[in-house]
């Protein structure tokens, strides 16, 4: 109530690279779309970079620990990455939870930022078209969404399709 402008307008007035990105984004994170930057950030200081309200992994790979994803779990249910079998995500092959498959590992789990751009992305479901740097290379990601699943093409790998109702077999 003491701000000189609406929160989102005020924040994006300085963070113009984020503003440019979300202006052309096909999908936007709900707090960004609603101009609620403080849902994730504390502009007056925070223990987590970059001014985050809670922990969020900074690296490409990380062992899965529930506390490391405290920022995400402030809004999203933990079951998105903890349950191997669930219907709570659209990213599943049958009932096999593909978020859990990629993230929930004791050593080299991929972090959310590998596939998702937290402010906005040029593909559906906040999926980025280039993963953050993996060494000197940014990995291209191409997501093709269907009504019941989709196909993901990552880097040099063959396409992987998934379907919630008619699971794709990879045996």
Regions found by a protein language model. Give the residues of each.
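Inter-heme linker and motif-flanking segments adjacent to c-type heme-binding CXXCH motifs
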Residues: 1-171
């Amino acid at each position: 109530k003491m701000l000189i402008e609406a929160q989102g307008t005020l924040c994006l007035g300085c963070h113009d690279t984020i503003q440019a990105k979300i202006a052309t984004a096909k999908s936007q994170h709900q707090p960004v779309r609603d101009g609620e930057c403080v849902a994730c950030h504390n502009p007056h200081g925070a223990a987590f970079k970059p001014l985050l309200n809670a922990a969020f992994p900074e690296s490409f790979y990380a062992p899965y620990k529930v506390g490391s994803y405290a920022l995400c779990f402030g809004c999203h249910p933990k079951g998105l990455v903890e349950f191997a079998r669930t219907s709570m995500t659209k990213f599943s092959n049958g009932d096999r939870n593909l978020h859990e498959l990629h993230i929930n590992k004791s050593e080299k789990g991929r972090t959310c930022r590998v596939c998702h751009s937290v402010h906005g992305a040029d593909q559906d479901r906040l999926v980025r078209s280039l993963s953050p740097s993996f060494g000197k290379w940014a990995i291209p990601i191409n997501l093709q969404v269907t009504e019941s699943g989709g196909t993901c093409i990552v880097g040099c790998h063959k396409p992987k399709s998934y379907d919630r109702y008619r699971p794709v077999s990879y045996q």
